[in-house]
Amino acid sequence: MATHNKKRLNLKDKYRYLTRDLAWETTYQKKEDVFPLEHFEGIKITDWDKWEDPFRLTMDTYWKYQAEKEKKLYAIFDAFAQNNGHQNISDARYVNALKLFLTAVSPLEYQAFQGFSRVGRQFSGAGARVACQMQAIDELRHVQTQVHAMSHYNKHFDGLHDFAHMYDRVWYLSVPKSYMDDARTAGPFEFLTAVSFSFEYVLTNLLFVPFMSGAAYNGDMATVTFGFSAQSDEARHMTLGLEVIKFMLEQHEDNVPIIQRWIDKWFWRGYRLLTLIGMMMDYMLPNKVMSWSEAWGVYFEQAGGALFKDLERYGIRPPKYVEQTTIGKEHITHQVWGALYQYSKATSFHTWIPGDEELNWLSEKYPDTFDKYYRPRFEFWREQQAKGERFYNDTLPHLCQVCQLPVIFTEPDDPTKLSLRSLVHEGERYQFCSDGCCDIFKNEPVKYIQAWLPVHQIYQGNCEGGDVETVVQKYYHIKSGVDNLEYLGSPEHQRWLALKGQTPPTAAPADKSLGAA
């Protein structure tokens, strides 16, 4: 009896059979009813077969690939915990950067998982559906590994105990939350422009490189490891972001003005969101990697400039107000740290005045702005603290209606003047931090008048109290004086000094970084 050896499928054919060949054309239901949001935004798709799949993975390959990474990752997590790896970090102040990451970035990734799970259902093209499904699983995995990486710190440091609860409530966490809420309430193509292109492709290096490099410079091997584990995923996500934009632009010329408007909007929203990351780089890392100004120059001005030059042939120009970011990179991190320093009664992490070494580093990195505009402010606050009059602002800051950051930024052409824009819509006045946010509101006022602004809600009595202290403890679940306020002399600082066998200083040191080990 003759036997026939069946030829094995190559990877390309296997991928096609297990993804696109599982799709079908609708018959007993109208295609418009099955995919109702595909035409919602005015994007015209003429041929889904032109979609170039960026992931090129089948599910069985995906699970095998990720399982191998998980094994190595959790082995390192276990070793880190068993060897008390938290004792090897540069200084306890570094953990405050992790608190910011866990409360602001990890829930953002979970929202991305929810968003990709939803929009993947909205595309009639099988390639796009599979890509969104893969990225949804990636984002969920990132949340899990980040939480597991930082869970060890929760045993030894304050402020990491209730990140999911805080994300929906704390005033400065409404910045990342409002970004993703905005994206998830848009149509499917705008969501991919917001997350896959504007954030994952254009700006993601400004998020992950500072955090992972900062972790390496400060002895945090757990965070470095999950960063490396996510790196290959992020490469696929960036590829998807570029493919999305090029695919839409190549499908129909009518898509160009719609996409340009989205790029203008989401670039500005991403830039404002990353202000928190820039502040972390410049102020929260005891051992610093690079300044925000340097990072913006490398990862956006150089890399982003080349990208938009490439997109010129499709009729796409650089984002609106991009020139303001070149000016703002010299100012925004100092302004935000100054705001969080004075409003730290309502944060879940500690703040402090940089020591002289750090102030000198900032002077070196920002030679045209720091000594002139910001160093005198920090030195004055340090003098006040030395006299026992550490400055706290007993109010809460006024928030921008769109990005929800405090309105504390200055005019692009005048660093001594606050930037404030306002307009009246249907008899109600709304305020904004910049021209960029004001323009976004003008294009979609019906959306942004519904924004849930934490400070407004607190003062209206909708947050379990009308005063800051009650809201912080009851509504935010933050332990006042333990999770927040000044780092110097805090319980966390005292424990770190005891661990290192040091004696606590009586005042903020003027000649070196605080409590550096």
From Swiss-Prot:
Residues that bind Fe cation 1: 109, 139, 142, 234
Record pathway: Aromatic compound metabolism; phenol degradation
Entries under InterPro entries matching the protein: Ferritin-like_SF (IPR009078), Phenol_Hydrox (IPR003430), RNR-like (IPR012348), YHS_dom (IPR007029)
Observed effect of gene inactivation: Cells lacking this gene cannot grow on phenol.
Keywords per UniProt: Aromatic hydrocarbons catabolism, Iron, Metal-binding, Monooxygenase, NAD, Oxidoreductase, Plasmid
Cofactor note: Binds 2 Fe(2+) ions per subunit.
UniProt record similarity statement: Belongs to the TmoA/XamoA family.
Record's protein name: Phenol 2-monooxygenase, oxygenase component DmpN
Organism: Pseudomonas sp. (strain CF600)
Record lineage: Bacteria, Pseudomonadati, Pseudomonadota
